[in-house]
Amino acid sequence: MQSVKLGVGDKIMTQESSSWQQIVAKYQHPQRLKSIWQLVNTLIPYAILWFLMVQSLQVSYWLTFVLSIIAAGFLIRLFIIFHDCGHGSFFKSHKANFFWGYVTGVLTFTPYYYWWHSHAQHHACAGDLDHRGIGDVWTMTVEEYLKASRKTKIIYRVARNPFVLFVIAPAVLFLILHRLPTKEKGGRANKSIYFTNLGILGMAIIMSLIMGWKTYLMFQIPVVMMSASLGVWLFYVQHQFEGVYWERQEKWDYVTEALKGSSFFKLPKVLQWFTGNIGFHHIHHLSPRIPNYNLERCHNENPLFQNIKPITFFTSFKSLAFRLWDEQNQRLVGFDYLKQLKKS
């Protein structure tokens, strides 16, 4: 299969591109009523859960905690809507995508334009060993790790620790880093951060007037932290799994990356609903213009996708063992693999 490279960051199309493009084309059209219904069946239950959490404090904090877990699930679903708006796939209208992207960005504590810009780079570079570090999980090759300084090795081991990766890092990212403008992010991205911060401040003031600022923070911070942790876990499993595709830029192929470098995370139907079908990540990377509510149908209706081995809820936990990319053997390995290298 030969590839024609269009340049760094551009898609790489194969000779079979016309066939897969024809396959995905009919699923790329947003349907206004479906999008509106998705907003309704996500925003309204999320608001109701906030009301119930306030009322439940008079009964039991454990009941409040259970409700907050469900609320975190709805916040993940809101993030998927936010995500689709960023890809321009939720509505046909650019203005509608921008408006609802901003609104859901405030609710999910994520600046719309800044996130969209870095996420677009992720789509352009996912699975490319020469363009890591943009919108992805820090992953070193075995060779890079062995050549790294002791300090870098310690930092990397800490960064790849599951507690740091799925608890501390998501909280820092969504609660702190997404609030801070920098020169590196650029003017438009920083404006996005400023306006998102203003929106969050306005939301916090209104909610504090309704329920008190202590109660608001007692709900908001845990809900954001839980949804952020689960969201990062989803993202991790989508690109760090057994059999994943990584390649150097000169050999990197767009279609192969989508179908082999992005997982088919087959979740139970309830979890699939809360995560907005993002488990069909191979379809999403093949065509980010497909709305989340069309991803499953695209997968099920086309033979091209039927031989892709799914990752299940339970098998996904195998990904926790992966720490490094073994470039020589084209696979992810754990730190224990380094001990085997020393013995050999």
PLM regions with names:
Residues 1-72, 106-221, 293-344:
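Non-catalytic, topology-defining segments of multipass membrane proteins
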Residues 14-15, 93-95, 133, 272-274:
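Short helix-capping and inter-helix turn/linker motifs at the boundaries of alpha-helical repeat units
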Residues 49, 86, 90-91, 246, ...:
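Active-site-flanking alpha-helical
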Residues 56-82, 99, 103-113, 224-229, ...:
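Membrane-embedded alpha-helical segments that form the functional core of polytopic membrane enzymes
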Residues 72-82, 111-115, 163-177, 220-250, ...:
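Transmembrane alpha-helical segments that form the membrane-embedded catalytic/substrate-channel core
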Residues 78-87, 115-127, 234-243, 274-290:
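Histidine-centered catalytic micro-motifs
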Residues 81-99, 124-141:
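Aspartate-rich (DDxxD/NDxxD/DxxxD) Mg2+/diphosphate-binding motifs
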Residues 253-271:
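Cytosolic juxtamembrane regulatory segments of multi-pass membrane proteins
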